[in-house]
């Protein structure tokens, strides 16, 4: 399913792909994904004198959840926010010209044909946000549908997830305003149980581009996954050719392998 999300990002026109995955799992998954994927627009371009010389690689980066956030607020929504923040910090440390102005989110739990997104690239990259919908359901309805967001939405989403409780109660404070009583264990770190709708809400659907995916499967549980496996759409799904997506690594620079 992670491979499907990576391919979707490539068709949507992402410049880089950031996968949020902890260190204990990322080596295994990375061995399957690799370090980059070819841009399908340039790969399948049959025009020009030498199309093979105009290939464009989309690098893939791996981001682990910070240890201070694990088992505290590391829900799926926080992974989205943490991945966007990590890409911003890395890009801004290199050059102001590399700072991303929009983020595209793709979930491994939502499957649909990503090829139509290739024709929507120019609209996806506009200032207006983009949302994938299934029967008028979006991420706001706890569907694992893809969407984009910018700087303003990032601040709002991060504020929503920070509404979760911590370890200390805010009701019992001393004279200096410092909490003196801890919350019960079952009430601590409530953000790790947040649903998508708890964070990604009040979306600007009316002023944004909405793509209604004709065959979308929301893999929220085992039964929905079984329905996908038994569907006709599953029979049409195939892995991209090796020229586009295959395990490859970047060569070392100035070092011996």
Q: Which residues make up each language-model segment?
A:
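Conserved N-terminal catalytic core of the sugar/cofactor nucleotidyltransferase
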Residues: 1-100
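Domain-wide signal for the mature, well-folded portions of proteins, strongly enriched
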Residues: 15, 19-21, 184-190, 194-198, ...
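Short phosphate-engaging motifs
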Residues: 25, 112, 224-225
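A generic structural motif
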Residues: 43-64, 130-138, 212-215, 240-246
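Conserved core of the sugar-phosphate nucleotidyltransferase
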Residues: 94-102, 110-212
């Amino acid at each position: 399913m992670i491979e499907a999300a990576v391919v979707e990002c490539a068709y949507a026109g992402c410049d880089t792909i950031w996968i949020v995955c902890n260190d204990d799992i990322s080596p295994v998954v990375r061995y399957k994904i690799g370090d980059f994927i070819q841009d399908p627009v340039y790969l399948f371009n049959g025009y020009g004198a030498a199309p093979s010389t105009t290939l464009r690689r989309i690098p893939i980066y791996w981001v682990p959840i910070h240890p201070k956030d694990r088992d505290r607020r590391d829900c799926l929504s926080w992974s989205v926010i943490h991945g966007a923040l990590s890409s911003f910090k890395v890009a801004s440390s290199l050059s102001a010209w590399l700072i991303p102005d929009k983020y595209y989110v793709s979930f491994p739990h939502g499957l649909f044909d990503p090829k139509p997104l290739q024709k929507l690239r120019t609209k996806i990259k506009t200032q207006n946000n983009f949302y994938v919908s299934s029967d008028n359901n979006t991420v706001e309805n706890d569907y694992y549908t893809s969407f984009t967001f910018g700087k303003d939405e990032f601040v709002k989403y991060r504020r929503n997830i920070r509404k979760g409780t911590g370890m200390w109660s805010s009701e019992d404070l001393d004279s200096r305003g410092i909490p003196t009583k801890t919350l019960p264990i079952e009430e601590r770190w409530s953000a790790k149980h947040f649903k998508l709708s708890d964070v990604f809400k009040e979306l600007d659907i009316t002023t944004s581009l909405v793509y209604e995916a004709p065959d979308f499967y929301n893999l929220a549980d085992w039964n929905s996954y079984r329905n996908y496996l038994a569907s006709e759409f599953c029979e049409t799904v195939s892995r991209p050719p090796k020229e586009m997506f295959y395990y490859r690594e970047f060569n070392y620079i100035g070092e011996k392998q």
